[in-house]
């Protein structure tokens, strides 16, 4: 079963400049993660490879709908809640709607986990048991606080990992337009960062580099900014 009751992200920020200042630590290999932000070597065909979205809540639904609007095909929607999965799959033209990760299409090479933070390791472990060409697959999650390494079960089977964090709040699964002009933090393996950066631009957002160490600081700062702004209203 897939757990996907993802709470709406509470990490909207009104000033992207403060985010970039918090993302300067070097990457896990000693390099600057910003080195991978350029998408010069990512072809349009690669960006448009079919995607599977796991989770049909506010974040998963909004992401899937935005992907479809930007002509990135969504091949499968996997969710523990079958009715929302079927509705989302119908809306985005996905051929597969299921509550079983074993139904992940074998030709999908881009997988997005839009599930609660505490469910990430378990869902990753379930996926890792699936007979799939993981060494040719990028697996991303959309958590603001958790690093890409939370998907370590998939790392062990050869997948490239990506944390793809939209710095935005999603109140409903239909908030496709909420991606307009936002920032998306990217962290993980080099292949994942390159893809995530190019995809963020495709969605109409601006990518910025994160490290596992800086993610929590950025998440907390954005949450405080969002909550502070709300308190002023």
Report each predicted region and the residues it spans.
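Phosphate-coordination loops involved in phosphoryl transfer and adenosine-cofactor binding
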Residues: 47-50, 136, 181
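Rossmann-like NAD(P)(H) cofactor-binding subdomain of soluble oxidoreductases
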Residues: 92, 98-175
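NAD(P)+-binding Rossmann beta1-loop-alpha1 motif at the extreme N-terminus of oxidoreductases
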Residues: 2-10, 15, 21-36, 40-99, ...
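Short, hydrophobic beta-strand segments that form beta-sheet elements in well-ordered domains
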Residues: 75-79, 139-142, 184-187
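Internal alpha-helical scaffold of NAD(P)-dependent oxidoreductase catalytic cores
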Residues: 84-91, 176-218, 225-233
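Conserved dinucleotide-binding and phosphotransfer motif residues
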Residues: 70, 157, 203
């Amino acid at each position: 079963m897939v757990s996907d009751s993802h709470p709406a992200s509470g990490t909207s920020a009104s000033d992207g400049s403060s985010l970039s200042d918090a993302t300067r630590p070097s990457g896990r290999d000693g390099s600057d993660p910003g080195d991978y932000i350029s998408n010069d070597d990512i072809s349009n065909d690669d960006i448009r490879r079919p995607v599977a979205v796991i989770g049909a809540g506010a974040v998963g639904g909004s992401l899937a709908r935005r992907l479809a609007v930007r002509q990135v095909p969504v091949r499968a929607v996997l969710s523990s809640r079958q009715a929302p999965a079927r509705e989302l799959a119908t809306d985005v033209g996905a051929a597969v709607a299921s509550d079983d990760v074993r139904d992940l299409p074998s030709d999908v090479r881009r997988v997005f986990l839009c599930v609660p933070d505490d469910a990430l390791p378990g869902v990753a472990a379930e996926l890792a048991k699936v007979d799939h060409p993981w060494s040719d697959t990028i697996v991303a999650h959309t958590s603001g606080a958790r690093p890409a390494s939370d998907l370590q079960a998939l790392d062990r089977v050869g997948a490239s990992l990506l944390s793809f964090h939209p710095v935005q709040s999603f109140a409903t699964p239909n908030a496709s337009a909420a991606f307009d002009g936002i920032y998306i933090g990217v962290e993980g393996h080099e292949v994942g960062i390159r893809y995530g950066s190019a995809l963020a631009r495709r969605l109409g957002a601006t990518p910025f580099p994160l490290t596992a160490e800086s993610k929590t600081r950025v998440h907390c700062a954005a949450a405080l900014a969002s909550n502070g702004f709300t308190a002023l209203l």
